[in-house]
Swiss-Prot record:
UniProt KW keywords: Ligase
Protein name in UniProt: Probable indole-3-acetic acid-amido synthetase GH3.13
Function field: May catalyze the synthesis of indole-3-acetic acid (IAA)-amino acid conjugates, providing a mechanism for the plant to cope with the presence of excess auxin.
Inducing stimuli: By auxin.
Gene that encodes it: GH3.13
EC id: 6.3.2.-
GO BP, sorted A to Z: response to auxin; response to light stimulus
Alphabetized Pfam families for the sequence: GH3 (PF03321), GH3_M (PF23571)
Originating organism: Oryza sativa subsp. japonica (Rice)
Amino acid sequence: MTSTSSENAPDHDHDHDASSPAPATATAAALPPMIPACDPHDGPACLELIEVLTTRAAAVQRRVLAEVLAMNTGTDYLRRFLGDEVVAAAGGEDELAAAFKERVPVVEYEDVKPYIERIANGAPSSLISSKPITELLTSSGTSGGQPKLMPATEEELDRKTFLYNLLVPVMNKYVEGLDEGRGMYLLFVKPEITTASGMVARPVLTSYYKSRHFRRRPDSPYTRYTSPDAAILCPDSRQSMYAQLLCGLARRGEVLRVGAVFASAFLRAVKFLEGHWRALCADIRAGRADPAVVTDAACRGAVDAVLAARADPDLADAIAAECGGASWRGIVRRLWPRTKYIDVIVTGSMAQYIPLLEFYGGGLPLVSTMYASSESYFGINLRPLDPPEEVVYTLLPNMCYYEFIKVEKDGDGEKVRDGEVVDLVGVEVGAYYELVVTTFTGERVCSPFDFFPTSCMGLSTPSDRKING
């Protein structure tokens, strides 16, 4: 993962109200708001915005922490460490930030878990946040055998949308014509639970796909997918997979990019296709989804609307000819010949799938565009066509407040912290770090991610593999 570079411009933290709308462009003399307006169709403005955020990382980070503290010093959690007397004695934002770093401990999830569980059971959000907690995001990590729960506010969806809006402008620097077709992205929702208080707990991607930010997104060639939303939102993952592949094959000639969030999910789709291509071809010939397979009414109706305009026996025969061949080497490129790249995360634990992706992809570039977790969305890949083993993510300093704890390996290979906490622009090239994240709800929690700085511009992941910045 990469961090951002040190700032080179004077600080103007108060030039804009963080809640006011602003264009994506920003001059060196003014910081953009915390969630800037960002039009993915205006590539130059988006790239300029990235430049402003990253070159002025220190100023942006100071503003993030100031906003976090301005909002949350009255919460039960922060009042334990920053009481009224401490807040009153702080003469300004810098003094309050210093008190935060001195008095608020870096904790593990287990330390804030009791607060989150109380909110899940009906306690007010003000235990940890000045803004209403609207949902709980489940993490892939566990605590006591149960998924970890991360509190989230409505504003977090705005932050995620902002980061998503930056991805296409970056890709457009390297790949032309992405507005001339569709993306075949295989996206899925997972089961959610309702807590005792009635609050929903669900995975971060499920939260986003069910939000108005995704479902009511503006029509754009960059967010035009082969899958109708009803297929993505189908709660039955098997039906969803079948329906999305069916639409992707039916719209074969329009597909310019393919992908899923993780490499493993994309490969599951390829394996599913390998076992079901005959049935999928039969549905394309018939111009409708088999009602015995796609039983979800909304999903089937949306898929049938796609197929009705494309009932094409010749297309089915062409797909069958590719799938029925002696080898599936390069099958992705052969089935979707206009495809320019495969968009999946191939860093960290997903790196093990690179050989299979290369086998099925037939030479298509493997692109990891972003890095995120349940705590926060962190950063983007500014050199997306670099080989997978050289991927570097650039942390966006407006997404949360970042700190780092240097770690060393002892004689047994175990990590040992040195105790010193440094901020985003204070990391040293060549050292390993654990990430500490303070989100806009105010907890200063050690994240399960390790980072390795590759240059003054960033940190890479995973920590056990050197990445050249």
